[in-house]
Amino acid sequence: MSWSSHPPSVIFYILSLLSSACLAYVATRDNCCILDERFGSYCPTTCGIADFLNNYQTSVDKDLRTLEGILYQVENKTSEARELVKAIQISYNPDQPSKPNNIESATKNSKSMMEEIMKYETLISTHESTIRFLQEVYNSNSQKIVNLRDKVVQLEANCQEPCQDTVKIHDVTGRDCQDVANKGAKESGLYFIRPLKAKQFLVYCEIDGSGNGWTVFQKRLDGSLDFKKNWIQYKEGFGHLSPTGTGNTEFWLGNEKIHLISTQSSIPYVLRIQLEDWNGRTSTADYASFKVTGENDKYRLTYAYFIGGDAGDAFDGYDFGDDSSDKFFTSHNGMQFSTWDSDNDKYDGNCAEQVGIGWWMNKCHAGHLNGVYYQGGTYSKTSTPNGYDNGIIWATWKSRWYSMKKTTMKIIPLNRLAIGEGQQHQLGGAKQVGVEHHVEIEYD
């Protein structure tokens, strides 16, 4: 590309036309489909792409202004070079005989002029390369803007009709999922519940053929959700509740909601932990009288006793062989919840900060179902940022260096545990409270 073949005025004119073609698209609630905030993104919307288009256009306009400035500098430098060449041509007369006393002076002047010409030629070449690069960037950005506008048009066409929610939320409501099942609900899925002294919120209820209604508050499936969250996020909950019985999303219901459910009834709740390894083997661990206190007590976890389950009682701690006090300092009963920005554990440091994830920490843990998701299960000290076991672990079933493939944490009133599912053999200590037959749940 030569400078003479692309006059600056022409390039400026082209750039001006291209810049004026970037029209801003302002997204409002009138021209976007606004979905109910309770659900995930189940309907197409133009708002996100429109916002991105506006931001992207601002960046392109800035690049254009920079390009115009560079072109202006190049034009000035080129004009200076042309004037210099013209002056050389005028001063040079081949017919005039050289005077001996002027030879040295003329030689110096010629050398200086040649150096100036070479300098300007180098500068022009550099600016031409910059112009070519910026032109390529501009062309690429222009094409991206065109593509985004096409997508906006497509989405606007799709949203001419009111968006239809594809999420099925059942009409039955109750204090928890067992109350929902008692009122006739027979299908697992999304339900609104309203615990005592609380506003209603959405939960996933797992309802079996025996009428047992489990309220699910944690799900790990595939590592698609990052559990490295702060205190507020763990309090409010994060992730998406699955609208289908397959349970195909990961989520944490929220510490405040878990507290409201687990402390509302005179009948205690059972916590069931379900685990699956990377070979498809499953196991469970059940805990009686599970509760989570309020935020003023840092959402402290408590339970009465371990009922049973082939996963073992990791909440009671585990002797890793590192120290004689391992089991005591890795137990979880009575521990407050900790996150990287709210240290409430028994360790001098911050266990949650070491692993980056919220949990009921001691010094630190024998079971951690919110841990880092490791594909394939096995990991080692060298694969962690600081050498600590930070996977999805349950030390009484698998090694601390084995991360589970799937986990579920769910609760149900204690008087339902022995009904169906062949759970009678797991009651163990539950017989101490005299639960031998079906009793409908009662609330204070």
UniProtKB/Swiss-Prot annotation:
Extract the Gene3D superfamilies matched here: 1.20.5.50, Gamma Fibrinogen, chain A, domain 1 (3.90.215.10), Gamma-fibrinogen Carboxyl Terminal Fragment, domain 2 (4.10.530.10)
Q: Which residues form a coiled coil?
A: 25-165
Subcellular localization, as worded in the UniProt entry: Secreted
Chain ranges passing through the membrane: none
Q: According to the UniProt entry, where is the signal peptide?
A: 1-24
Domain called Fibrinogen C-terminal: residue spans: 168-415
Pfam families on file: Fib_alpha, Fibrinogen_C
* InterPro entries associated with the record: FIB_ANG-like (IPR037579), Fibrinogen-like_C (IPR036056), Fibrinogen_a/b/g_C_1 (IPR014716), Fibrinogen_a/b/g_C_dom (IPR002181), Fibrinogen_a/b/g_coil_dom (IPR012290), Fibrinogen_CS (IPR020837)
Cellular component, GO annotation: collagen-containing extracellular matrix; extracellular space; fibrinogen complex
Keyword list (alphabetical) reads:
Blood coagulation, Calcium, Coiled coil, Disulfide bond, Glycoprotein, Hemostasis, Metal-binding, Secreted, Signal
What disulfide bonds does the UniProt entry report for this chain? 177-205, 351-364
* Residues that hold Ca(2+) according to the record: 343, 345, 347, 349
Q: Name one GO molecular function term.
A: signaling receptor binding
Q: Is Flavoprotein included in the keywords of this UniProt record?
A: no
Query: What residues bear carbohydrate chains?
Result: 76
The known PTMs are summarized as: Conversion of fibrinogen to fibrin is triggered by thrombin, which cleaves fibrinopeptides A and B from alpha and beta chains, and thus exposes the N-terminal polymerization sites responsible for the formation of the soft clot. The soft clot is converted into the hard clot by factor XIIIA which catalyzes the epsilon-(gamma-glutamyl)lysine cross-linking between gamma chains (stronger) and between alpha chains (weaker) of different monomers.
Superkingdom of the organism of origin: Eukaryota
Q: What processes in GO biological process is this protein linked to? A: cell-matrix adhesion; platelet aggregation; protein polymerization
How it assembles, according to the record, is:
Heterohexamer; disulfide linked. Contains 2 sets of 3 non-identical chains (alpha, beta and gamma). The 2 heterotrimers are in head to head conformation with the N-termini in a small central domain.
- Quote the record's domain comment: A long coiled coil structure formed by 3 polypeptide chains connects the central nodule to the C-terminal domains (distal nodules). The long C-terminal ends of the alpha chains fold back, contributing a fourth strand to the coiled coil structure.
* Purpose of the protein: Together with fibrinogen alpha (FGA) and fibrinogen beta (FGB), polymerizes to form an insoluble fibrin matrix. Has a major function in hemostasis as one of the primary components of blood clots. In addition, functions during the early stages of wound repair to stabilize the lesion and guide cell migration during re-epithelialization. Was originally thought to be essential for platelet aggregation, based on in vitro studies using anticoagulated blood. However, subsequent studies have shown that it is not absolutely required for thrombus formation in vivo.
Q: From the Swiss-Prot or TrEMBL record, give the protein name.
A: Fibrinogen gamma-B chain
The organism encoding this protein is Bos taurus
